[in-house]
């Protein structure tokens, strides 16, 4: 399948993509509130769900929807997804969309995978629930823990603690680290350092760790024990003539200065995503993790790798730690662990931390932390089957095979006059929209450029993530080459339509 946007690119390979600004067809579908609403984090502009007299509309529904503005629930019908099949989802009216975000970075094996469905139904028929408290547990939870430990090869890990989500995993990390330092007689070593623009979840603690203002505003966050250091976004934050390595050195120096300012005896841990996800898909600059890890080791500060998005093949490696030679003390995983078919998350705990936790719990009589659904047998059974599929179908090799075309196909649009940067690796990509191709020249917030682009994608049958004037792609890992081409085509057509709309807005502004 060759769409017009690709034909134009190929026929004008010697010219800049910024010259390709004419829309292939008239577009009259613009966000209903694009001139009124500010650029929004996390929610795609639901501009296509306009007021309707259809009986199956759900405007004013009874759900307090996550990461959704109140006016969206009140004034617009939501996009109601009814079923999924492979890399596609279908709405309640039967419209087909290629799911270019894999739900929320999570349905790595696509929709309607029969082996995962069978694993769930078999376990439901055998043992639908039992807990893991008080030295009681289930066989699926024991088997999954062993499987995860065997798959993680960046360093040896000791134990697995099960949660229901990535947010719960990162929230639990803080309790584990505090418990650990209390056991070692270090009651003041409690502060956490995270990074600006990071995302670690939306509970009180995990939202505090996150470095996105939208998660803090009017929630009285972040918590006082959380500090934030530099975002490692080279394109946006490097100094003139500063190389990536020099940028990484400066950020490591800034981290060390923050540690010294606060007192190394007060800093417990540093948490980082191997590739930042919801903050805009930000891969680290060269030598970044090497230099950061050296600082942490110098001051006896634990490293937590948040692999909720990057684990199980997203980057073309089984874990993000493998890609960047990260040697963490603790790891958070979720999402692709079960391909999102069942809620489950987990923490990988190093042997050193495990030994201290065991010693402390022996003194106290219990390790008093856990959840009703920790190690839920159905979730664990599905996750076990998902991990088998990753290995049996060589999903990592498949990602490595299709990722180059995915990356080069989207990055071919980097010359667009409204694109500042397209960045990513493996099967994850982010696009940042700016004026004059400068990180210091944003579009007016009221234009909602990211939302305009998201609406154009949705109109063409593709779902993406919008975060202000950043958009993200993170499709299922099972994509076929034809599906990769479909995403590239729809991205290109949506981009041209957005360019045309921005030209109109500029003309009106004068």
Curated annotation (Swiss-Prot):
Quote the transit peptide annotation as a residue range: 1-41
InterPro entries recorded for this chain? Aminotrans_3, Aminotrans_3_PPA_site, PyrdxlP-dep_Trfase, PyrdxlP-dep_Trfase_major, PyrdxlP-dep_Trfase_small
A single MF term (Gene Ontology): adenosylmethionine-8-amino-7-oxononanoate transaminase activity
Name the residues that bind substrate: 199, 335
Q: Pfam families, from UniProt?
A: Aminotran_3
The protein's location, in the record's own words, is: Mitochondrion
UniProt lists the family membership as follows: Belongs to the class-III pyridoxal-phosphate-dependent aminotransferase family.
Q: What is this protein called?
A: Probable gamma-aminobutyrate transaminase 3, mitochondrial
Species of origin: Oryza sativa subsp. japonica (Rice)
